[in-house]
Regions:
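Conserved proline-anchored active-site loop of SAM-dependent methyltransferases
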Residues: 40, 54-68, 77-82, 124-137, ...
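Short active-site oxyanion
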Residues: 50-54, 73-74, 216-221, 270-274
Length: 319
Protein backbone atom coordinates (compact mmCIF):
# COMPACT_ATOMS: atom_id res chain seq x y z
CA UNK A 1 0.00 0.00 0.00
CA UNK A 2 1.38 3.39 -1.00
CA UNK A 3 1.32 5.96 1.78
CA UNK A 4 1.31 9.67 1.07
CA UNK A 5 4.62 11.26 1.97
CA UNK A 6 4.37 14.20 4.36
CA UNK A 7 7.45 16.34 4.89
CA UNK A 8 7.09 19.29 7.23
CA UNK A 9 9.58 21.97 6.28
CA UNK A 10 8.67 25.60 6.98
CA UNK A 11 11.09 27.00 4.44
CA UNK A 12 14.00 25.89 2.32
CA UNK A 13 17.28 26.74 4.02
CA UNK A 14 20.93 26.49 3.04
CA UNK A 15 23.85 26.79 5.44
CA UNK A 16 26.60 27.38 2.89
CA UNK A 17 29.33 26.56 5.43
CA UNK A 18 28.29 22.91 5.17
CA UNK A 19 28.69 22.68 1.38
CA UNK A 20 31.26 20.08 0.32
CA UNK A 21 34.71 21.55 -0.24
CA UNK A 22 36.36 21.05 -3.61
CA UNK A 23 35.29 21.48 -7.22
CA UNK A 24 32.00 20.34 -8.67
CA UNK A 25 32.43 17.66 -11.31
CA UNK A 26 30.55 16.44 -14.37
CA UNK A 27 30.83 16.25 -18.14
CA UNK A 28 31.24 19.55 -20.02
CA UNK A 29 27.69 19.41 -21.30
CA UNK A 30 25.20 22.00 -22.54
CA UNK A 31 22.79 22.89 -19.72
CA UNK A 32 24.98 21.34 -17.03
CA UNK A 33 24.13 22.18 -13.41
CA UNK A 34 27.77 21.97 -12.37
CA UNK A 35 27.86 25.61 -11.20
CA UNK A 36 25.16 24.95 -8.61
CA UNK A 37 25.26 21.16 -8.11
CA UNK A 38 27.03 21.39 -4.75
CA UNK A 39 24.40 23.82 -3.45
CA UNK A 40 21.49 21.75 -4.78
CA UNK A 41 22.65 18.58 -3.04
CA UNK A 42 23.38 20.42 0.20
CA UNK A 43 19.87 21.94 0.06
CA UNK A 44 18.45 18.43 -0.28
CA UNK A 45 20.55 17.14 2.62
CA UNK A 46 19.74 20.00 4.98
CA UNK A 47 16.01 20.13 4.27
CA UNK A 48 15.01 16.57 3.36
CA UNK A 49 17.66 14.35 4.95
CA UNK A 50 19.98 11.72 3.53
CA UNK A 51 17.94 8.53 3.91
CA UNK A 52 15.85 8.69 0.71
CA UNK A 53 17.07 7.64 -2.75
CA UNK A 54 17.52 10.49 -5.22
CA UNK A 55 16.38 10.13 -8.82
CA UNK A 56 18.31 12.37 -11.22
CA UNK A 57 15.84 11.82 -14.06
CA UNK A 58 17.13 14.44 -16.53
CA UNK A 59 20.73 13.66 -15.59
CA UNK A 60 22.56 15.14 -18.58
CA UNK A 61 26.28 15.47 -17.93
CA UNK A 62 25.97 13.88 -14.49
CA UNK A 63 26.85 16.85 -12.27
CA UNK A 64 24.01 16.15 -9.81
CA UNK A 65 24.64 12.39 -9.84
CA UNK A 66 28.36 12.93 -9.22
CA UNK A 67 27.66 15.28 -6.33
CA UNK A 68 25.26 12.77 -4.77
CA UNK A 69 27.92 10.06 -4.95
CA UNK A 70 30.60 12.30 -3.44
CA UNK A 71 28.18 13.02 -0.58
CA UNK A 72 27.48 9.33 0.01
CA UNK A 73 23.87 9.51 -1.19
CA UNK A 74 22.00 6.81 -3.10
CA UNK A 75 21.32 8.12 -6.60
CA UNK A 76 19.73 6.82 -9.81
CA UNK A 77 21.22 8.42 -12.92
CA UNK A 78 18.94 8.68 -15.95
CA UNK A 79 18.79 10.57 -19.22
CA UNK A 80 16.74 9.88 -22.32
CA UNK A 81 19.88 10.39 -24.43
CA UNK A 82 21.87 7.15 -24.32
CA UNK A 83 24.93 8.86 -25.80
CA UNK A 84 25.39 11.07 -22.75
CA UNK A 85 24.88 8.31 -20.16
CA UNK A 86 27.28 6.07 -22.08
CA UNK A 87 29.79 8.93 -22.18
CA UNK A 88 29.51 9.51 -18.42
CA UNK A 89 29.99 5.82 -17.64
CA UNK A 90 32.92 5.62 -20.07
CA UNK A 91 34.80 8.55 -18.57
CA UNK A 92 34.32 7.32 -15.02
CA UNK A 93 35.67 3.87 -15.93
CA UNK A 94 38.80 5.11 -17.74
CA UNK A 95 42.15 6.59 -16.70
CA UNK A 96 44.12 9.74 -17.40
CA UNK A 97 46.06 8.27 -20.34
CA UNK A 98 42.80 7.48 -22.14
CA UNK A 99 41.48 10.99 -21.49
CA UNK A 100 44.50 12.41 -23.32
CA UNK A 101 43.39 10.64 -26.51
CA UNK A 102 40.19 12.69 -26.70
CA UNK A 103 41.86 15.91 -27.81
CA UNK A 104 41.75 16.17 -31.62
CA UNK A 105 42.60 18.62 -34.39
CA UNK A 106 40.12 20.64 -36.41
CA UNK A 107 40.50 18.27 -39.36
CA UNK A 108 39.95 15.20 -37.18
CA UNK A 109 36.91 16.84 -35.58
CA UNK A 110 35.05 17.17 -38.86
CA UNK A 111 36.07 13.65 -39.89
CA UNK A 112 34.53 12.28 -36.69
CA UNK A 113 31.46 14.47 -37.11
CA UNK A 114 30.90 13.07 -40.62
CA UNK A 115 30.99 9.44 -39.47
CA UNK A 116 27.67 7.68 -39.87
CA UNK A 117 28.12 5.29 -36.95
CA UNK A 118 29.77 7.04 -34.03
CA UNK A 119 31.21 5.31 -30.98
CA UNK A 120 31.01 6.63 -27.42
CA UNK A 121 34.59 7.85 -27.80
CA UNK A 122 33.57 9.71 -30.96
CA UNK A 123 30.74 11.37 -29.04
CA UNK A 124 33.18 12.47 -26.34
CA UNK A 125 35.67 13.82 -28.89
CA UNK A 126 32.94 15.96 -30.44
CA UNK A 127 31.75 17.09 -27.00
CA UNK A 128 35.18 18.05 -25.68
CA UNK A 129 36.48 19.71 -28.86
CA UNK A 130 33.38 21.68 -29.86
CA UNK A 131 32.37 25.27 -29.26
CA UNK A 132 29.86 25.45 -26.41
CA UNK A 133 29.99 21.63 -26.13
CA UNK A 134 27.33 21.47 -28.84
CA UNK A 135 29.24 18.96 -31.03
CA UNK A 136 28.69 21.20 -34.10
CA UNK A 137 31.63 23.59 -34.58
CA UNK A 138 35.27 23.14 -33.64
CA UNK A 139 36.40 24.85 -30.44
CA UNK A 140 38.87 27.17 -32.17
CA UNK A 141 38.54 29.27 -35.31
CA UNK A 142 40.18 28.04 -38.50
CA UNK A 143 42.75 30.80 -38.20
CA UNK A 144 44.00 29.83 -34.73
CA UNK A 145 43.09 26.16 -34.44
CA UNK A 146 46.39 24.55 -35.51
CA UNK A 147 48.52 26.68 -33.23
CA UNK A 148 46.31 26.21 -30.17
CA UNK A 149 45.78 22.48 -30.78
CA UNK A 150 49.50 21.83 -31.27
CA UNK A 151 50.32 23.85 -28.17
CA UNK A 152 47.84 21.86 -26.10
CA UNK A 153 49.28 18.56 -27.38
CA UNK A 154 52.84 19.67 -26.64
CA UNK A 155 51.94 20.73 -23.10
CA UNK A 156 50.36 17.33 -22.45
CA UNK A 157 53.37 15.46 -23.85
CA UNK A 158 56.05 17.54 -22.13
CA UNK A 159 54.38 18.46 -18.84
CA UNK A 160 51.47 16.01 -18.41
CA UNK A 161 49.12 18.70 -17.11
CA UNK A 162 45.58 19.80 -17.93
CA UNK A 163 45.16 22.57 -15.36
CA UNK A 164 47.93 25.03 -14.58
CA UNK A 165 49.05 24.99 -18.20
CA UNK A 166 49.77 28.72 -18.16
CA UNK A 167 52.62 28.08 -15.71
CA UNK A 168 54.44 25.65 -18.03
CA UNK A 169 57.60 26.71 -19.84
CA UNK A 170 56.12 25.53 -23.14
CA UNK A 171 53.07 27.79 -22.80
CA UNK A 172 55.15 30.80 -21.75
CA UNK A 173 57.61 30.28 -24.58
CA UNK A 174 55.00 29.92 -27.31
CA UNK A 175 52.70 32.71 -26.13
CA UNK A 176 55.59 35.17 -26.04
CA UNK A 177 56.85 34.17 -29.48
CA UNK A 178 56.26 35.34 -33.04
CA UNK A 179 53.61 32.73 -33.89
CA UNK A 180 51.36 33.79 -31.03
CA UNK A 181 51.90 37.48 -31.74
CA UNK A 182 50.90 36.87 -35.35
CA UNK A 183 47.28 36.00 -34.62
CA UNK A 184 47.04 38.34 -31.64
CA UNK A 185 47.47 41.22 -34.09
CA UNK A 186 44.51 40.15 -36.23
CA UNK A 187 41.51 42.52 -36.21
CA UNK A 188 39.57 41.01 -33.31
CA UNK A 189 37.43 42.65 -30.66
CA UNK A 190 39.01 43.36 -27.29
CA UNK A 191 36.94 40.63 -25.66
CA UNK A 192 38.11 38.04 -28.18
CA UNK A 193 41.71 39.08 -27.66
CA UNK A 194 41.34 38.43 -23.95
CA UNK A 195 40.15 34.89 -24.67
CA UNK A 196 42.91 33.92 -27.10
CA UNK A 197 45.47 32.72 -24.51
CA UNK A 198 43.02 30.14 -23.16
CA UNK A 199 43.49 26.53 -24.21
CA UNK A 200 39.93 25.34 -23.67
CA UNK A 201 40.78 21.80 -24.79
CA UNK A 202 43.00 21.33 -21.74
CA UNK A 203 40.31 22.81 -19.51
CA UNK A 204 37.79 20.33 -20.90
CA UNK A 205 40.14 17.40 -20.28
CA UNK A 206 40.62 18.63 -16.72
CA UNK A 207 36.86 18.38 -16.18
CA UNK A 208 36.86 14.80 -17.44
CA UNK A 209 39.85 13.92 -15.30
CA UNK A 210 38.01 14.98 -12.16
CA UNK A 211 35.40 12.27 -12.80
CA UNK A 212 38.07 9.64 -12.06
CA UNK A 213 37.32 10.29 -8.39
CA UNK A 214 34.04 8.42 -8.78
CA UNK A 215 35.80 5.16 -9.68
CA UNK A 216 36.69 4.50 -6.05
CA UNK A 217 33.25 5.41 -4.76
CA UNK A 218 30.66 3.69 -6.89
CA UNK A 219 29.98 1.82 -10.09
CA UNK A 220 27.67 3.99 -12.16
CA UNK A 221 25.07 2.55 -14.48
CA UNK A 222 22.70 4.97 -16.14
CA UNK A 223 19.22 4.29 -17.48
CA UNK A 224 17.54 5.84 -20.53
CA UNK A 225 13.87 6.12 -19.68
CA UNK A 226 11.30 8.81 -20.27
CA UNK A 227 10.28 10.48 -17.01
CA UNK A 228 7.02 8.53 -17.32
CA UNK A 229 9.08 5.41 -16.67
CA UNK A 230 9.47 6.48 -13.05
CA UNK A 231 5.75 6.86 -12.33
CA UNK A 232 5.75 3.99 -9.83
CA UNK A 233 8.52 5.46 -7.67
CA UNK A 234 7.43 6.28 -4.12
CA UNK A 235 9.17 7.56 -0.99
CA UNK A 236 12.03 9.13 -2.93
CA UNK A 237 13.45 12.52 -3.88
CA UNK A 238 12.96 13.35 -7.56
CA UNK A 239 15.34 16.01 -8.84
CA UNK A 240 14.02 17.16 -12.21
CA UNK A 241 15.88 19.37 -14.66
CA UNK A 242 13.63 19.34 -17.75
CA UNK A 243 13.99 21.42 -20.93
CA UNK A 244 13.18 25.01 -20.04
CA UNK A 245 9.62 26.06 -20.69
CA UNK A 246 9.43 28.41 -23.67
CA UNK A 247 12.96 27.71 -24.91
CA UNK A 248 13.74 26.37 -28.37
CA UNK A 249 14.83 23.12 -26.67
CA UNK A 250 17.67 22.48 -29.12
CA UNK A 251 19.61 19.34 -28.40
CA UNK A 252 16.70 17.33 -27.06
CA UNK A 253 15.67 14.14 -28.83
CA UNK A 254 11.96 14.95 -28.94
CA UNK A 255 9.81 18.02 -28.49
CA UNK A 256 9.00 18.43 -24.81
CA UNK A 257 5.46 19.03 -23.55
CA UNK A 258 5.97 21.16 -20.43
CA UNK A 259 2.34 21.06 -19.29
CA UNK A 260 2.19 17.28 -19.51
CA UNK A 261 5.37 17.16 -17.44
CA UNK A 262 3.94 19.51 -14.79
CA UNK A 263 0.83 17.33 -14.50
CA UNK A 264 3.04 14.29 -13.96
CA UNK A 265 5.28 16.07 -11.43
CA UNK A 266 2.23 17.28 -9.48
CA UNK A 267 0.95 13.71 -9.14
CA UNK A 268 4.40 12.38 -8.20
CA UNK A 269 4.66 14.97 -5.42
CA UNK A 270 1.85 13.19 -3.56
CA UNK A 271 4.20 10.31 -2.69
CA UNK A 272 7.66 11.82 -3.22
CA UNK A 273 9.66 14.96 -2.67
CA UNK A 274 9.67 16.59 -6.11
CA UNK A 275 12.14 19.37 -6.87
CA UNK A 276 12.20 21.03 -10.30
CA UNK A 277 15.09 23.15 -11.52
CA UNK A 278 14.13 25.93 -13.94
CA UNK A 279 14.08 29.67 -14.54
CA UNK A 280 10.31 29.94 -14.44
CA UNK A 281 7.22 27.71 -14.34
CA UNK A 282 3.87 28.98 -15.62
CA UNK A 283 1.83 26.34 -13.77
CA UNK A 284 0.48 28.03 -10.63
CA UNK A 285 0.49 24.77 -8.67
CA UNK A 286 4.27 25.23 -8.28
CA UNK A 287 6.20 27.93 -6.46
CA UNK A 288 9.82 29.03 -6.10
CA UNK A 289 11.45 27.64 -2.97
CA UNK A 290 15.03 28.74 -3.63
CA UNK A 291 16.77 31.12 -6.06
CA UNK A 292 20.41 30.91 -7.10
CA UNK A 293 21.14 34.59 -7.57
CA UNK A 294 24.54 34.00 -9.17
CA UNK A 295 23.33 31.30 -11.58
CA UNK A 296 21.66 33.01 -14.49
CA UNK A 297 21.28 32.86 -18.22
CA UNK A 298 19.84 34.82 -21.10
CA UNK A 299 17.03 32.85 -22.68
CA UNK A 300 16.46 33.46 -26.36
CA UNK A 301 13.43 31.25 -26.79
CA UNK A 302 9.97 32.74 -26.90
CA UNK A 303 11.26 36.24 -27.54
CA UNK A 304 12.40 36.68 -23.93
CA UNK A 305 15.93 38.01 -23.70
CA UNK A 306 15.88 39.06 -20.02
CA UNK A 307 18.39 37.61 -17.61
CA UNK A 308 16.81 35.03 -15.35
CA UNK A 309 18.07 33.31 -12.21
CA UNK A 310 18.09 29.55 -11.87
CA UNK A 311 15.51 28.50 -9.27
CA UNK A 312 14.17 25.43 -7.50
CA UNK A 313 10.41 24.85 -7.61
CA UNK A 314 8.10 22.58 -5.63
CA UNK A 315 4.37 21.96 -5.47
CA UNK A 316 2.74 24.51 -3.16
CA UNK A 317 2.22 23.09 0.31
CA UNK A 318 4.27 19.95 -0.35
CA UNK A 319 7.24 20.95 1.79
Amino acid sequence: MIQKMTVLVKQINLDEKKIRKGKAIGLPYQGSKKKISKKIIEIIKQNFGTDKPIYDIFGGGGAITAECILNGLEVHYNDLDKDITNAFERVVSQDREWIKTLIISREEFFEVKAKENKTTDDFLKLLVNSFGNKKIDYLYSKETSDLKYNLAKEIIEKHDVFSGYRQTETYKKVTSGLDWNWFNTKPETHKQLQQLPRLQQLEQLQQLGQLERLQKVNKIKGTNKSYHGFSEVSGAILYLDPPYEGSHQKGYINQFDSQEFYDWAFEMAKNNIVIISSYSISDERFETVYSFDKAHSTLQGGGDSKRKNEKLFMVKGSY
